[in-house]
Amino acid sequence: MRKYEALLLLSPELATDNRQEIVENLKGVLERQGTTMLSVDEWGMKDLAYPVQKKTRGHYTRFEFAAPATAIAEFERIVRITDGVMKFITVKLADKYVPEGA
């Protein structure tokens, strides 16, 4: 398994409950693919450097997880079709993930 980070930019028009629902759904997608969630950070509402989908603010959420390479394609497919996600990026953080105690 490799260690990844995904950064999501969510629409500022979403209610708090809707944002939490999107985050929980995406965590579920990752867990069904056999990933290990390391952290989920809510960065909150931030001003954007340039408009994205005609919006100047967005809510940032960061996922850090260890996953097999095959899980990333499914995760990104689901993120692309999820309403409320304006932008996202997934990057590989390290060559190999070693669980604690291994």
Swiss-Prot record:
Name of the gene this protein is made from: rpsF
Family: Belongs to the bacterial ribosomal protein bS6 family.
Pfam name, any one: Ribosomal_S6
Gene Ontology BP annotations: translation
Lineage: Bacteria, Pseudomonadati, Thermodesulfobacteriota, Desulfovibrionia, Desulfovibrionales
Molecular function, one GO term: structural constituent of ribosome
Name of the protein described by the UniProt record: Small ribosomal subunit protein bS6
GO cellular component: cytoplasm; ribonucleoprotein complex; ribosome
Keyword line: Ribonucleoprotein, Ribosomal protein, RNA-binding, rRNA-binding
Species name: Solidesulfovibrio magneticus (strain ATCC 700980 / DSM 13731 / RS-1) (Desulfovibrio magneticus)
